[in-house]
């Protein structure tokens, strides 16, 4: 008599942990418009722009989404918000923090990668990047 022995091998599922640093960071940085908002702030004088300037420079973004993304970036200390009530209308400016400025290197790396692998290898200067400063 033959006894068949069935061995069940437990295969560990590899999933991203909820508290993984990359997972937590990607949750807000990978949202549509977030990196472009950071780039537009970087282009501003002293890395600062008013809400209306951001809205005008990001074609297609809605005021609601821009407000949400700026609030998320402010909560993460990537952007600081300054409100000047001494003028009318009230002036609200957003500025990249040191943390936000550190993200510019990541954006440069993304651009380098995209030019090499994804964007038909078109060198800068031949693309309409609206005076990109990267």
Predicted features and spans:
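Generic structural signal for secondary-structure transition and capping sites
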Residues: 34, 46, 78, 112-115, ...
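Basic, amphipathic "hinge/linker" alpha-helix immediately C-terminal to the N-terminal HTH DNA-binding motif
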Residues: 86-107
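N-terminal leader segment of winged-helix/HTH proteins
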Residues: 1-29
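Short loop/turn motifs at secondary-structure junctions and domain boundaries
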Residues: 16, 85-86
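N-terminal helix-turn-helix DNA-binding core of bacterial DNA-binding proteins
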Residues: 20-65, 93
């Amino acid at each position: 008599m033959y006894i068949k022995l069935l061995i069940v091998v437990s295969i560990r599922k590899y999933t991203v942990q909820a508290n993984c640093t990359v997972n937590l960071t990607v949750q807000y940085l990978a949202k549509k418009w977030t990196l472009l908002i950071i780039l537009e702030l970087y282009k501003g004088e002293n890395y600062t722009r008013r809400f209306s300037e951001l809205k005008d420079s990001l074609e297609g973004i809605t005021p609601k989404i821009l407000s949400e993304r700026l609030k998320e970036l402010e909560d993460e200390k990537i952007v600081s918000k300054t409100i000047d009530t001494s003028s009318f209308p009230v002036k609200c400016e957003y500025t990249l923090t040191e943390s936000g400025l550190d993200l510019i290197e990541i954006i440069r790396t993304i651009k380098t990668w995209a030019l090499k692998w994804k964007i038909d290898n078109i060198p800068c200067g031949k693309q309409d990047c609206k005076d990109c400063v990267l």
